[in-house]
Swiss-Prot record:
This is Glycerophosphoinositol permease 1. The chain crosses the membrane at residues 39-59, 94-114, 117-137, 141-161, 186-206, 216-236, 273-293, 313-333, 337-357, 363-383, 404-424, 432-452. Residues 487-500 have a biased composition (Acidic residues). It catalyses: sn-glycero-3-phospho-1D-myo-inositol(out) = sn-glycero-3-phospho-1D-myo-inositol(in). Belongs to the major facilitator superfamily. Sugar transporter (TC 2.A.1.1) family. The gene is GIT1. Glycerophosphodiester transporter that mediates uptake of glycerophosphoinositol (GroPIns) as a source of inositol and phosphate. Does not possess detectable glycerophosphocholine (GroPCho) transport activity. Although no glycerophosphoinositol transport activity occurs in the absence of GIT1, C.albicans is still able to use glycerophosphoinositol as a phosphate source at pH 7.5, albeit slowly. Thus, a second, GIT1-independent, mechanism must exist for utilizing glycerophosphoinositol as a phosphate source at physiological pH. InterPro entries: MFS_dom, MFS_sugar_transport-like, MFS_trans_sf, Sugar_transporter_CS. Glycans are attached at residues 93, 175, 506. It holds the Pfam family Sugar_tr. Disulfide bonds: none annotated. GO terms for molecular function: glycerol-3-phosphate transmembrane transporter activity; glycerophosphodiester transmembrane transporter activity; transmembrane transporter activity. It is found in: Cell membrane.
Length: 519
């Protein structure tokens, strides 16, 4: 059988298997010249707006993920008898459980229904859930906390929905005309997520000054402010257009999930397990950071909300530069090695703080610096690259689903980490939370090395071509793209009108006939 023409930019070429006797089987061929032409034209306005609209509201996700850090302290002061450790875990985990459902369900619909529908749905859940959290009430304090728990779950569903819909949309938009796609993706997605933590603390300090000791007003205001970011981009998200990649490669009917699993299972294991390990460390350290800090500051400041928030803000400020450094090097080193370096940071700083905990604890500033550097390494490596790798490792027809599953397994890690954090502190001691972080870092290095592919800035369309040819070779008979193509017209199309991919028909004379397949 004939080999496909090998392009200088194509890392792998797809061939019809030698044992395949079907000479009428059609295949796609990746055309690297089309991508060169796209990139030569510079960043298009529509692509830039799609990236910004997809990522901007993730500030709200970062805000919601981190707001509970200080709210746990506020609730403990306002309701010292009712707000027990188990209730604190219940309220904190409600968002994470909702996030898991949002990631899986909206991940599926992002592929099956569409990117725009999914991202608008995510925005609606975020706005509604956050507003109802601020309005939580009940006949009893426990009743109020149950309402808060339920609507933290609704908010979590919106947060989870944002992950696959926003990240996949940003990745596909960046692929169209952005040369250093990895850095652009990180600045549009993980930067808002990471900035949400310090932003939440800045808002808390302002609200605390305004409201004084009116703790009820503080927590209701803090939840209500979370509506602002999704509201600010809601109109623009309604006007978003569908990416070219999704238009060309979507599978609307009879999605071949079993074939996809057989093809992508090593990558799916890598993204799921690595994300589980990352969230197992970073989420409890974010949610309970106020409690961790209150254990190392002087006793006179343990219940001083402003002091705790200020130290927490310093912690977030030290962790944030990891996002920028990681965004700069990710297209140079590649996703895989950047992730491995970040996990190594968990090993180094986790062991420094854990093994030297009792020596470092009396020096609050030094403790915060080492703690912040550990979190910064998390941002530099897996924090930046889990979303990026999950959106680039899979073809467009299943990208949302695979991303949603990977992120959901990550949030399972967050739930497990949050649930076990307090028992670890109580039974093993505070230092073991950092030693376990180092162990997770070692596991993350191994998983990344074995299962995560070495990606830099490859065209996402190239992965689509490989996956389409794999489906064809395995007898799948469905259609690609939003529009249904007439097969006779496809076979009669000219190569001069071809876009980024072409269909190749192998005949008995081993000739290669190029025809247009992606208009």
């Amino acid at each position: 059988m004939s080999d496909l023409v090998k392009s200088s930019e194509v890392i792998e070429t797809t061939e019809v298997p030698p044992h395949n006797n079907n000479n009428n089987k059609r295949h796609f061929k990746y055309d690297s010249e089309q991508r060169k032409q796209r990139l030569a034209g510079g960043v298009k306005l529509k692509d830039a707006l799609m990236i910004l609209c997809a990522g901007f509201a993730l500030i709200s996700d970062g805000y919601q993920n981190n707001v509970m850090s200080m709210m746990n302290k506020v609730f403990a002061l306002e309701y010292p008898k009712e707000y027990t450790a188990s209730l604190s875990t219940q309220v904190s985990n409600a968002s994470l459980v909702g996030t898991i459902f949002g990631q899986v369900i909206i991940g599926l619909t992002a592929d099956y229904i569409g990117r725009k529908w999914s991202i608008v749905t995510a925005t609606c859940f975020l706005i509604f859930g956050t507003m109802m959290c601020a309005a939580s009430h009940g006949k009893t304090v426990n009743g109020m906390f149950w309402m808060l728990t339920i609507f933290r779950g609704v908010t979590g569903f919106g947060i989870g929905a944002e992950y696959p819909s926003s990240s996949v949309t940003a990745s596909e938009a960046a692929n169209e005309s952005v040369k250093r796609r990895g850095g652009a993706f990180i600045l549009a997605t993980n930067l808002p997520l990471s900035f949400g933590g310090p932003f939440a603390l800045c808002i808390f300090l302002i609200v605390r000054r305004i409201c004084g000791n009116h703790l009820d007003a503080i927590w209701r205001t803090m939840f209500a402010i979370g509506c602002f970011w999704p509201l600010s981009v809601f109109y623009f998200r309604l006007k978003m257009v569908t990416s070219e990649l999704y238009t060309k490669s979507a599978i609307k009917q009879r999605a071949p999930y079993w074939l996809a699993l057989k093809y992508y299972w090593p990558r799916l294991i890598g993204t799921c397990v690595a994300w589980f390990l990352y969230d197992f460390v970073t989420f409890p350290n974010g949610i309970f950071s106020a409690g961790i800090i209150s254990n190392v500051i002087p006793k006179s400041e343990k219940n001083n909300l402003e002091k705790i928030a200020e130290w927490n803000l310093l912690l977030g400020a030290i962790a944030l530069p990891g996002v920028f450094v990681g965004a700069y090097v990710v297209d140079i080193l590649g996703r895989k090695y950047t992730m491995m370096i970040g996990f190594c940071g968990y090993i180094v700083f986790g062991l420094i703080v854990g093994c030297g905990y009792h020596q470092i604890k009396p020096i609050t500033g030094l403790f915060i610096v080492f703690y912040g550097l550990m979190m910064s390494c998390g941002n530099f490596g897996p924090g930046n690259n889990m979303g990026l790798t999950s959106s680039e490792s899979f073809a467009t027809p299943i990208r949302g689903t695979a991303y949603g599953i990977s992120a959901a397994i990550g949030k399972v890690g967050a739930v497990v980490g949050t649930k076990t954090f307090s028992p670890i502190q109580k039974n093993l001691g505070d230092k073991w939370t950092f030693i376990i972080a180092a162990i997770c870092g070692l596991a993350g290095v191994l998983v990344t090395f074995i299962f995560i592919p070495h990606l830099k800035d490859e065209d996402l369309l190239e992965e689509d071509v490989k996956f389409k040819n794999y489906l064809i070779d395995n007898g799948w008979k469905g259609k690609f793209g939003i529009q249904e193509y007439d097969e006779e017209e496809d076979l009669e199309g000219s190569s001069e009108d071809s876009s980024d991919g072409e269909i190749v028909k192998n005949n008995t004379k081993n000739d290669v006939e190029k025809v247009d397949a992606l208009k």
